[in-house]
C-alpha cells in the first residue's frame, strides 16, 4: 500500500484527534497539539459531511472551550487553517480564535 505524504498527514491528524477525544472524555484538559488536532479533524470531517466554508469557520470556534484545555492554550492558538476537501474541491478553512 502506498500512502502519499498528504494522506499520511491526514492519518496522523485522525490518530492525534482520536487520542485527544479519549483524553477529553476522561476529563483531562487538552494540550496544544491535542487541541489543534481535534479541531482540525472536526473541520476536515465537517467538510466531507457537506458543510460550507462559512459554516465551518463559525462552527470551528465552538468545538472546544477554555474549560477543555490547559491554561494558556487558547492564547497560543490565534487561528487554525486547514485545507479541507469539499464536494467541489479543496478549500482553505480559517478559524480565528478557535478556543473561546
From Swiss-Prot:
Cellular localisation: Cytoplasm
Catalyzed reactions per annotation: urea + 2 H2O + H(+) = hydrogencarbonate + 2 NH4(+)
EC nos: 3.5.1.5
GO aspect biological process, one term: urea catabolic process
Conditions for induction: By urea and nitrogen starvation.
Pathway assigned to this chain's UniProt record: Nitrogen metabolism; urea degradation; CO(2) and NH(3) from urea (urease route): step 1/1
Gene Ontology CC annotation, any one: cytoplasm
Disulphide connectivity of cysteines: none
Primary subcellular site in the record, as a coarse category: cytoplasm
Entries under Gene3D superfamilies matching the protein: Urease, gamma-like subunit (3.30.280.10)
MF (Gene Ontology): nickel cation binding; urease activity
Assigned keywords, A-Z: Cytoplasm, Hydrolase
Nucleotide-binding keyword on record: no
Assembly and oligomerization: Heterotrimer of UreA (gamma), UreB (beta) and UreC (alpha) subunits. Three heterotrimers associate to form the active enzyme.
Alphabetical list of PANTHER family matching this protein: UREASE
Protein name: Urease subunit gamma
Native organism: Corynebacterium glutamicum (strain ATCC 13032 / DSM 20300 / JCM 1318 / BCRC 11384 / CCUG 27702 / LMG 3730 / NBRC 12168 / NCIMB 10025 / NRRL B-2784 / 534)
Amino acid at each position: 500500500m502506498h500512502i502519499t505524504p498528504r494522506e499520511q498527514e491526514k492519518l496522523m491528524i485522525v490518530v492525534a484527534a482520536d487520542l485527544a477525544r479519549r483524553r477529553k472524555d476522561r476529563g483531562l484538559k487538552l494540550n496544544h497539539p491535542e487541541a489543534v488536532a481535534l479541531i482540525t479533524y472536526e473541520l476536515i470531517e465537517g467538510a466531507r459531511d457537506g458543510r460550507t466554508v462559512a459554516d465551518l469557520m463559525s462552527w470551528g470556534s465552538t468545538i472546544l472551550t477554555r474549560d477543555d484545555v490547559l491554561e494558556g492554550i487558547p492564547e497560543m492558538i490565534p487561528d487554525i487553517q486547514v485545507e479541507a476537501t469539499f464536494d467541489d474541491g479543496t478549500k482553505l478553512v480559517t478559524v480565528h480564535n478557535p478556543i473561546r
